[in-house]
Amino acid sequence: MPLNVSFASRNYDLDYDSVQPYFYCDEEENFYHQQQQSELQPPAPSEDIWKKFELLPTPPLSPSRRSGLCSPSYVAAFASFSPRDDDDGGGGSFSSADQLEMVTELLGGDMVNQSFICDPDDETFIKNIIIQDCMWSGFSAAAKLVSEKLASYQAARKDGGSRSPARGHSACSTSSLYLQDLSAAASECIDPSVVFPYPLNDSSSPKPCASPDSTAFSPSSDSLLSSAASSPRASPEPLVLHEETPPTTSSDSEEEQEDEEEIDVVSVEKRQPPAKRSESGSPSAGSHSKPPHSPLVLKRCHVSTHQHNYAAPPSTRKDYPPTKRAKLDSGRVLKQISNNRKCASPRSSDTEENDKRRTHNVLERQRRNELKRSFFALRDQIPELENNEKAPKVVILKKATAYILAIQAEEQKLISEKDLLRKRREQLKHKLEQLRNSCA
């Protein structure tokens, strides 16, 4: 049966409304072509409102970067999906228009992120990741679309069986003509060394960045293209999904956006299995002049965008500035260090505390005994409480105060009497002297 490129009818215009706008300024577009063909239900009122006001799409879209599709791995992948001849038992062949439709379906337009199916050796792979608008959450849906297309193509390829090298070479040449026009956008890419001073991939040996004009087709890519077209074994392994990391789905990305406020991005890493290395090191691999083609492994990584949800209520949690937070952390560390120093010798500290408590108890007992004896002595000096052994301390203090005041008053009275008596004595002495002088 011939290779069927068409998929189930899905309204991708509604699924990818963040990527494709509903209308263009000063241009009449058929926005509801599926509705006119199948006479489905009328469009949503939101779409009529957008069409009524004819607003420009915001935010603006980024320029399309399709130079990554010209990599040898992608050309080899397309060569593996080439149609069969009538004599191979396939049931028919495709014309040039069908091949063009296949390429258009495989490319997927702006709905497919080109960083999924490009070769990591190509310099435009890094540029695609840098320039692609990841804030509109188009990666998860694009990854799902690519996985569905590749699964259908691989199923059709397995049903088709083996293909002739001549037919694969013609398909590669045709696809290279279609893909060569896409390399013009590579000159408009930004050099990743300007944006990221450090390398983005985990390769041990850094590779010098090539000029944007030379990233479309290099001599190494031409040799890989010719070898991929001539060798029938190079076609079945252009793109391999890692077993530990399943392809990203839209539900997974939505959950991770709600929990971690991060967007999933699929990065391509080049890995060579040990079986391939053993085959390349064996002498039987001398017949093949090219090195074994390394599979592409899709892995998931997280790119933090730090998006702010303006619709959410203001948080009541107080965020400290970095300097104040550093001071608080340093204070906590110092407090922990002081506590550790205090608890360095627990036995010695316990003995010291027991000794201090014992001496304190002894001194407190002595103080209480002295105070009790003082109250007893004061009670004995008061005539009213002299024989009252159960007199409280308050009564002792009050009676002692009254007794002291009475004694002070009596003292003042006695002092005044003493002064009068002294004066009387002086007068009597003076009178005695006068009498002695008169008698003489």
Curated annotation (Swiss-Prot):
Q: Give the compositionally biased regions (Acidic residues).
A: 252-264
- Compositionally biased tracts (Low complexity): 210-239, 280-289
The chain residues annotated with the modification Phosphoserine are: S6, S62, S71, S82, S152, S162, S294, S315, S330, S345, S348, S349
Q: Which residue positions does N6-acetyllysine occur at?
A: K144, K149, K158, K276, K318, K324, K372
Q: Where on this chain is UBR5-degron (motif)?
A: 356-365
Glycan attachment positions: T58
BP term (GO), one: regulation of DNA-templated transcription
Q: Where is this region: Leucine-zipper?
A: 414-435
Query: Its quaternary structure?
Result: Efficient DNA binding requires dimerization with another bHLH protein. Binds DNA as a heterodimer with MAX. Interacts with TAF1C and SPAG9. Interacts with PARP10. Interacts with KDM5A and KDM5B. Interacts (when phosphorylated at Thr-58 and Ser-62) with FBXW7. Interacts with PIM2. Interacts with RIOX1. The heterodimer MYC:MAX interacts with ABI1; the interaction may enhance MYC:MAX transcriptional activity. Interacts with TRIM6. Interacts with NPM1; the binary complex is recruited to the promoter of MYC target genes and enhances their transcription. Interacts with NUP205.
Domain commentary: The 9aaTAD motif is a transactivation domain present in a large number of yeast and animal transcription factors.
Q: What is the name attached to this protein's record?
A: Myc proto-oncogene protein
Q: Which gene encodes it?
A: MYC
